[in-house]
Amino acid sequence: MAPGTGRDFHLHLVSDSTGETLITVSRAVTAQYAGVTPIEHVYPLVRSEKQLDRVLAEIEEAPGIVLFTLLEKDVAVRLEARCQEINCPSLSIIGPVMQLFQAYLGADTTGRVGAQHTLNADYFKRIDALNYTMMHDDGQHVESLEEADVVLVGVSRTSKTPTSVYLANRGTRTANVPLVPGIAIPRQLETLKNPLVVSLHAAPERLIQVRQNRLLSIGAGPGNEAYIDRQSVTEEVIHARRLSVKHDWAQLDVTRRSIEETAAAIMKLFADRRRQRRPD
C-alpha cells in the first residue's frame, strides 16, 4: 500500500515452518498503526522451488508487503529477487537476528526448520486442547461449545470420547455431546458458528455388539433392555441421522473405522472447511 492510497493492504507471510513467528511479529507491528488492516496471506511449510512458485503467483496477483522466514538460501534469494522485480517490499524476519547472533557467538546455525516451536507452540497447544476436551466430555459445559474447533455428536458407543482425546492430543479442541433418545439437544448446539460439528454414526448391529460388551464389563443387571434392543437402537440411529440432516452437520460412519481412521477423517473435514472459509 503506497502512502495515502488506502488503509488496507496485502501482507504475505512466507515460512518454511508454521508461520507463527511471522504472524506474531507482523501483528505486533500492525497494531502500532491505527485504522490499518492487513489482508493476511499465510504460506506455511514452503521448502521447495515448486511450493515457492505458488506463493509467487499469489503475491503477483495481490501485491503487498512480503515477510519471510526461510532457512533454505536458494528459496529465500529467489523470493527476494522476484519481489524486487515486481516492486514488492520484502524482509527476512529472522535473517538479521541470525546474523547478529552469528557475529557475536562466532558459531554457525543448525539450520533446523521450526526449531523455535519444538516446545512452546506444539506443547502448549496440546495441553490447552486436552484441558478443553476433558472439560467438555459427554455434554459438559455446553455454554462454551463455541470455543471448540470440533464438536462430535452421536448416540452412545460411537467412540466420541476416545476420538475427542485423540484429536486433543494433536492440538484440536474437541467437545462431544451425546444424542440421547427422548432428550432434546442443547440449544447451544443449534447456534454454533465456529466449530465443525461432526455426527458419528454406526450400524445398529455394531452398536448392539459394543453395548453388550460394555454392559458385561460393568456387570450391569436387568433394566437395560432398550439399550441393546434392535428396534430401539435402529430408531436411535435413524433419529440421529435426521438431526444431522436438519442441522447440516457433517456425518461420518465409524462402523468399520479405528479411532485413528475416524480422527484422520475428521481432521480432513476440518482442514477442508478452513480452506473453504478462507477469504479470497
From Swiss-Prot:
GO molecular function: ADP binding; ATP binding; phosphotransferase activity, phosphate group as acceptor; protein serine/threonine kinase activity
Top-rank taxon: Bacteria
Function comment: Bifunctional serine/threonine kinase and phosphorylase involved in the regulation of the pyruvate, phosphate dikinase (PPDK) by catalyzing its phosphorylation/dephosphorylation.
HAMAP family xref list: PDRP
This enzyme's EC code(s): 2.7.11.32, 2.7.4.27
Keyword annotations of the record: Kinase, Nucleotide-binding, Serine/threonine-protein kinase, Transferase
Record carries keyword Nucleotide-binding: yes
Enzymatic reactions: N(tele)-phospho-L-histidyl/L-threonyl-[pyruvate, phosphate dikinase] + ADP = N(tele)-phospho-L-histidyl/O-phospho-L-threonyl-[pyruvate, phosphate dikinase] + AMP + H(+); N(tele)-phospho-L-histidyl/O-phospho-L-threonyl-[pyruvate, phosphate dikinase] + phosphate + H(+) = N(tele)-phospho-L-histidyl/L-threonyl-[pyruvate, phosphate dikinase] + diphosphate
Native organism: Nitrobacter winogradskyi (strain ATCC 25391 / DSM 10237 / CIP 104748 / NCIMB 11846 / Nb-255)
InterPro entries on file: Kinase-pyrophosphorylase, PPDK_reg
Keyword hit for Iron: no
Binding residues annotated for ADP, in chain numbering: G154, V155, S156, R157, T158, S159, K160, T161
Organism classification: Bacteria, Pseudomonadati, Pseudomonadota, Alphaproteobacteria, Hyphomicrobiales
Protein name per its UniProtKB record: Putative pyruvate, phosphate dikinase regulatory protein
Family according to the record: Belongs to the pyruvate, phosphate/water dikinase regulatory protein family. PDRP subfamily.
Disulphides: none
Alphabetized Pfam families for the sequence: Kinase-PPPase
